[in-house]
């Protein structure tokens, strides 16, 4: 296959695709809006699942490198009631199928595996159009354009490539996440650190739509995800530019919860960050459009739970393998890839039930059922 694959988006999915293509001798160019690899924080920890993310890393021939960035002990898990009572606890004995790593380390690992110059930084896409000859032109904010024989949109929730294939747009799910960080937690936030434990902590009560979850990340950092089912105008009324005001307003929704849980909000060392959760229509499909396809959130954005990144990596790996297997028939490769992706993303996964357990009507019992099922299977 002599065609250079044009990839928009240097996230985990787009970079996995570029890596698998590179292994098979297929050139690619990745265009990324960010100015550099260090332009912004790449998010927190990510558990790489043995049934999708790890399969992608195996296809990318990066499992050894991945093992080198795994955070030991972070598969430990506990579920707490609102009074701080531990309802379920599982230690990390090294046998779990979801090792944790920092998203930034994963991205750096993928970048280091590509030829120098593969990623073109500082290329924010403003639009894309189909040319008369069937190829696609991508326009960038810096005034330049590129014409692609084969274009892949790996550009996330608000993809500029998606309109070439479908008019679907993300809609607010009704749920938002408020992120907080507590640094040097063992020293400065000892009670909270003890409550969270060595890995992940899920705090849930009987009220649907409220949860305080946290992970222990590198450097004794606690990264909390406070989940609230509220309309967007509720969050619009919160002044997130004033850290103390925002912390107090969000914490007020958890009246009656144990102070060591609400401290994940009130003791945050940064201003809380509001992240509304958007999703594309469930079961989204489109008719084949020659020379272009999507992967990851650009194709099947769902509620943020870690599964999306794993699926994006698997999409990238599967697309790369499909193109390598049919170098003389790109359209057949794209059609087969899309069909498999559609089916894969329509299949209910454990994380779907996990979200329902957090925001459904029978919390925290549903959540405990999932954790206990996981423990039996392991």
Annotate the PLM regions.
Residues 64, 185-192, 260, 326:
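Short helix-loop capping/hinge motifs at secondary-structure junctions, enriched
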Residues 41, 163-164, 305:
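Conserved catalytic-core motifs of eukaryotic protein kinase domains, centered on the activation segment
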Residues 38-39, 128, 160, 302:
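Short, solvent-exposed loop/turn segments at secondary-structure junctions
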Residues 335, 344-378:
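Alpha-helical, largely C-terminal catalytic domains
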Residues 1-6, 12-13, 38-50:
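Accessory recognition modules or surfaces
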Residues 2-5, 20-22, 47-186, 233-236, ...:
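Conserved N-terminal helical subregion
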Residues 196-198, 206-210, 216-222, 228-305:
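FAD/FMN-dependent oxidoreductases across multiple families
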Residues 7-27, 31-34, 152-153, 178, ...:
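Conserved mid-domain beta->alpha element of the FAD-binding
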């Amino acid at each position: 296959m002599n065609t250079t694959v044009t990839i928009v988006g240097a996230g985990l999915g787009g970079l996995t695709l570029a890596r698998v293509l590179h292994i098979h001798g297929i050139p690619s160019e990745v265009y990324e809006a960010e100015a550099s690899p260090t332009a912004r924080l790449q998010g927190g920890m990510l558990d790489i699942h043995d049934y999708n993310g790890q399969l992608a890393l195996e296809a990318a021939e990066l499992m050894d490198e991945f093992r080198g960035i795994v955070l030991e002990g972070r598969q430990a898990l506990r579920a707490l009631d609102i009074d701080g009572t531990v309802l379920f606890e599982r230690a990390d004995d090294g046998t779990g199928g979801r090792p944790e790593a920092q998203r930034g380390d994963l991205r750096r690992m993928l970048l280091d595996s590509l030829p120098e110059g593969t990623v073109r930084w500082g290329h924010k896409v403003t639009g894309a159009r189909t040319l008369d000859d069937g190829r696609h032109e991508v326009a960038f904010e810096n005034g330049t354009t590129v014409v692609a024989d084969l274009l892949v949109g790996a550009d996330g929730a608000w993809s500029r490539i998606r309109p070439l294939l479908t008019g679907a747009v993300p809609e607010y799910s009704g749920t938002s996440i408020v992120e907080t960080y507590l640094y040097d937690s063992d020293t400065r936030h000892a009670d909270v650190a003890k409550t969270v434990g060595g890995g992940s902590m899920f705090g849930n009560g009987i009220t649907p739509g409220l949860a305080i979850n946290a992970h222990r990340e590198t450097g004794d950092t606690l990264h909390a995800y406070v989940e609230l089912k509220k309309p967007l105008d509720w969050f619009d009324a919160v002044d997130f530019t004033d850290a103390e005001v925002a912390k107090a307003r969000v914490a007020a929704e958890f009246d009656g919860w144990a102070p060591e849980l609400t401290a994940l909000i009130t003791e945050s060392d940064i201003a809380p960050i509001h992240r509304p959760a958007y999703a594309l229509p469930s079961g989204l499909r489109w008719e084949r459009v020659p020379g272009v396809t999507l992967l990851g959130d650009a194709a099947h954005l769902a509620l943020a739970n870690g599964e999306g990144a794993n699926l994006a990596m698997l999409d990238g790996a599967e697309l790369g393998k499909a193109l390598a297997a049919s170098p003389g028939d790109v359209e057949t490769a794209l059609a087969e890839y899309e069909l498999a992706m559609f089916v894969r993303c329509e299949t209910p996964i454990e994380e779907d039930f996990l979200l329902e357990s957090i925001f459904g009507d029978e919390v925290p019992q549903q959540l405990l059922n999932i954790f206990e099922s996981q423990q039996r299977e392991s």
